[in-house]
């Protein structure tokens, strides 16, 4: 999109060979997870929830309800004007949607998603699909240089965040 955000992520970003970079502008992208429960101390403006599963249960006394409560605590740190971008394809996330107390935008492959991938085609190391946007303009055609449903879902989440930030379609794609 032409931005150079600051980022801190768990793995190395292939395009720059780093897992963190001090960028320019107003955006900071942090990959936060529930592994040590420290995500509960963050105060994001927009939070993306891709899935909630029983990884790292030891941090939560092997109690899945405590893990879910940790996510709700994290999302409760969003300001009143903040947004949750949530994968409606994940059954646990879908069950918790009514408990999210902030504006919530869903993404996924299911028809009920606000940002829905359809006509997904994978060929070799590439994927292409159309994004049907319920509330944000016309469909977008997307081509990724990586295969896999998880990459399609991650792209949908990024498109939803960019749309929420009023970034023009031409910059998103």
Regions found by a protein language model. Give the residues of each.
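Short beta-strand-centered segment that lines the nucleotide-binding/catalytic pocket of NTP-utilizing
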Residues: 3-16
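The start of beta-strands in P-loop NTPase/AAA+ ATPase cores
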Residues: 5, 26-28, 45-46, 82, ...
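General beta-strand structural signal in soluble alpha/beta enzymes
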Residues: 6-9, 31, 85-86, 106-107
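Acidic, Mg2+-coordinating active-site environments of NTP-dependent enzymes
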Residues: 15, 48-173
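Conserved phosphate-binding catalytic cores of ATP/NTP-utilizing and phosphoryl-transfer enzymes
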Residues: 16-21, 26, 151
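Conserved catalytic network of the ASCE P-loop NTPase/AAA+ motor domain
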Residues: 19-23, 39-41, 76-80
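Switch II (G3) loop of P-loop NTPases
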Residues: 26-36
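Switch II of P-loop NTPase G domains
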Residues: 35-45
């Amino acid at each position: 999109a032409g931005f150079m955000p600051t980022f801190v992520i768990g793995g190395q970003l292939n395009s720059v060979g780093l897992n963190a970079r001090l960028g320019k502008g107003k955006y900071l992208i942090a990959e936060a997870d529930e592994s040590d429960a420290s995500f509960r101390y963050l105060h994001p403006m927009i939070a993306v929830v891709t899935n909630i599963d029983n990884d790292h249960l030891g941090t939560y006394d092997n109690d899945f309800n405590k893990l879910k409560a940790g996510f709700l605590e994290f999302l409760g740190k969003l300001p009143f004007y903040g947004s949750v971008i949530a994968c409606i394809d994940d059954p646990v996330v879908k069950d918790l949607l009514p408990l999210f107390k902030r504006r919530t935008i869903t993404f996924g492959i299911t028809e009920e998603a606000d940002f829905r991938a359809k006509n997904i085609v994978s060929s070799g190391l590439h994927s292409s699909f159309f994004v049907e946007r319920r509330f944000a303009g016309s469909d977008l055609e997307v081509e990724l240089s990586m295969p896999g449903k998880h990459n399609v879902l991650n792209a949908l989440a990024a498109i939803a965040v960019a749309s929420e930030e009023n970034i023009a379609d031409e910059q998103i794609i």
